[in-house]
Amino acid sequence: PNSPVAIGDKVTITNYHGFCKGLLKKYGYLISDSLKKDVNLFHAIGDHDAERQWILKAVLSTTDIQVLKEMDASIKEARVPSGEAIQAYNQIVIQKLLPHEYITHNAVILFVLDILARFPEVKKFYQSYYPLIVVDEFQDTNCIAWELLKSIISDQTQLLFLGDPLQRIYGFIGALPNIMSTVVDEYQMTKISLSKNYRFRNNPEMLKLDRN
């Protein structure tokens, strides 16, 4: 039988950004020489923070700043950015931010989407490397994280997504509103609903909310 140690050697536990950083450490050089450096050594910032960094303010044009902000707004409004928008955004980060050792949180995922789209051999590797994908708190997935997941899912991938729409607390940063229903339809998954809530069984007010 598999021991916990043996199983641990075969399991990767991470989040969306952690997965992307691991991929960029291996393949980031495909889109930028600057990414030959460990991505964890860059200063990670939000898109709206870029213009507040004095060193970046000197190199970012008004148009650059607008592109960064529009991408952030698109993601927060759960609108999947086009391939052209991703390319324009990524080029600004590559040309203007990376040389000064800055990277945006969104770029960490958008760089990986670009790599998986442009280098099918990398995509095939990750699809075969992860035959089973389990995502907890799936209801908090935003549009670019969803695009990332779809990129590494193949016809043979086994999927288990755990989540509760009632606990969707990241709508303000772009968590997709109907992601639980979407994934059931898109991948013909079986929805399993828990009929009993043991966490709040002694709290009548929470049980009332759960039933509604």
Locations of regions flagged by a protein language model:
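Accessory N-terminal region flanking or inserted into the helicase ATPase core
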Residues: A50-V134, C143-L148, G171, N178
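Short conserved AdoMet
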Residues: A6, Q127, I153-S154
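Walker B catalytic acidic pair
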Residues: E137, G163-D164
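Short glycine-/polar-rich loops that comprise or flank the Walker A/P-loop
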Residues: G8-V11, D155-T157, E186-K191
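A mobile, often basic/glycine-rich helix-loop segment
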Residues: H17, Q156, A175-L176
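Conserved coupling/interface region of RecA-like P-loop/ASCE motor cores
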Residues: K26, Q167-G174, N178-N212
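Loop/turn-to-beta-strand initiation segments
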Residues: P131-L132, Q156-L160
